[in-house]
Swiss-Prot record:
Has antimicrobial activity against Gram-positive bacteria and fungi. It is found in: Secreted. The keyword Secreted applies. One of its GO terms (biological process) is killing of cells of another organism. It comes from Megoura viciae. Its main location: secreted. Contains four disulfide bonds. This is Megourin-2. Induction: By bacterial infection. It comes from the Eukaryota. The keyword Disulfide bond applies. GO terms for cellular component: extracellular region. Monomer.
Length: 63
């Protein structure tokens, strides 16, 4: 059976929803973050709508 830590890693992907400054930084950081257990790999970096701030939100395939 799964222990609590294994269950937590499946339910919780720390990269999901992380915010980065700049598209390039997001792509690098998000790819690394989405390799963690429970994340399912990199999906995309979504630009947060704000003209002044170039911030991007990380999305993994699961989480």
């Amino acid at each position: 059976y799964l222990d609590v830590n294994q269950i937590a890693s499946y339910l919780l992907c720390l990269g999901q929803g992380a915010v980065f400054n700049g598209r390039k930084t997001c792509q690098i950081g998000c790819r690394a973050a989405c390799q963690q257990p429970g994340c399912g790999g990199y999906k995309e970096c979504e630009q947060i709508p704000n003209i002044r701030l170039h911030k991007y939100r990380c999305h993994c395939n699961s989480g």
